[in-house]
Amino acid sequence: MLNKPEEFTKRVWKLARKIPKGRVTTYGILVGMAGGHPMMARMVTTILSKAPNHNLIPFHRIVYSSGKVWLDPKYKTERLKLYKEEGIKLDKNNKIVDFKNKLFTFE
C-alpha cells in the first residue's frame, strides 16, 4: 500500500497531467494507478486542487465511472468548451458518448 500520503498525492498529480487531450479517465482508475484504495477516489478533486500549478491539471478529463461528467455551474461553460475542442461529445444526461473508446487507462 502507500508509504506516505505525500507520495500518493504526488503520484495523483503526475498521473492526472498525463491524461491526453480527447481522452478521459475515472476517479477510480486514477486512484488505483496511483496506488490508493478505491475509496480514496472521493478525495481526488481535493488532492488535485492543492497541486502546485493546479491550473495545469486537466480536471475536465477526470470523470465518474459511468462516463458522466460533473458540470459545476461555476465552470460549466469552460468545461463544455474544452470537451468540444477535444472532440468529447456529451449526451443530454452529461454522459460521454462512446465512453469506452475515450477512456484512458494509463496502459
What does each of the following model-derived ranges do?
Residues 1-107:
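Nucleic acid-binding interface residues in structured DNA/RNA-binding domains
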